[in-house]
């Protein structure tokens, strides 16, 4: 489990984005919708 600070920062970033919601819609879903349109 030897992780560099960069690896941890990347994980934290992904975790934050995964939790981020806009009006109850997951950020991932918003991004997918924007790409589809």
From Swiss-Prot:
InterPro entries: Ribosomal_uS19_SF
A GO BP annotation: translation
Homology family: Belongs to the universal ribosomal protein uS19 family.
Cellular component per GO, a single term: ribosome
Originating species: Helix lucorum (Snail)
Name under which the protein is recorded: Small ribosomal subunit protein uS19
Gene Ontology molecular function, alphabetical: structural constituent of ribosome
Superkingdom field: Eukaryota
Keyword check for Zinc: no
Cystine pairings recorded for this chain: none
Keywords: Ribonucleoprotein, Ribosomal protein
